Structure formats: structure tokens, C-alpha cells
Amino acid sequence: MSLNAEIKASIVADNARCANDTGSPEVQVALLTAQINHLQGHFKEHAKDHHGRRGLLRMVSQRRKLLDYLKRKDVQRYAALIAKLGLRR
């Protein structure tokens, strides 16, 4: 159910602030967004997977916390990330 290494590497490369950046909020939010989008397809097929849904809600909460942090620290980076990922806020 996880993303493979090639997909993760491309997401990190697209959202990194510098060459070796893997832990910035932008990269973390992009990885969580990809994982959340991947799991949404799973839950269309397996609606009664409540244990997995709990993990999904945890990821959504973590993404929300990271976005709130980024908005508090740097509004321009926050707005650019939201536009790039196509999130609603």
C-alpha cells in the first residue's frame, strides 16, 4: 500500500528546496498527499477497512499540522505549495 521508491524520489525531486532536501515541510506534505491519494482508491474498493481508514485519518491530520506550520512560518511557500498540489485551501 505504500509508494515505491521511484515515485517517492520523483516527488522529493519535484518539491525539494535544494539538492539534498528530503525533510522540508513541502516534501513531507507532497509525500503525504501522494499517499493519501493512493489510499483513496483503496477505500473506494474496500469501504469496510476501518483499520486502514484510521491510518488515513492520521496521515490527513499530519498533513494538516505540517500545512499549518508552513502557513505560520512562511505564507508565500504555503501558498505556492497549495497551488502546486491542488489542495483546496
Curated annotation (Swiss-Prot):
PROSITE patterns: RIBOSOMAL_S15. Pfam families: Ribosomal_S15 (PF00312). GO terms for biological process: translation. Keywords: Ribonucleoprotein, Ribosomal protein, RNA-binding, rRNA-binding. One of its GO terms (molecular function) is structural constituent of ribosome. The keyword RNA-binding applies. SUPFAM superfamilies: S15/NS1 RNA-binding domain (SSF47060). Gene3D superfamilies: 6.10.250.3130, S15/NS1, RNA-binding. GO terms for cellular component: cytosolic small ribosomal subunit. CDD domains: Ribosomal_S15p_S13e. Part of the 30S ribosomal subunit. Forms a bridge to the 50S subunit in the 70S ribosome, contacting the 23S rRNA. Belongs to the universal ribosomal protein uS15 family. PANTHER family: RIBOSOMAL PROTEIN S15, BACTERIAL AND ORGANELLAR, SMALL RIBOSOMAL SUBUNIT PROTEIN US15M. HAMAP family: Ribosomal_uS15_B. NCBIfam families: S15_bact. One of the primary rRNA binding proteins, it binds directly to 16S rRNA where it helps nucleate assembly of the platform of the 30S subunit by binding and bridging several RNA helices of the 16S rRNA. This is Small ribosomal subunit protein uS15.
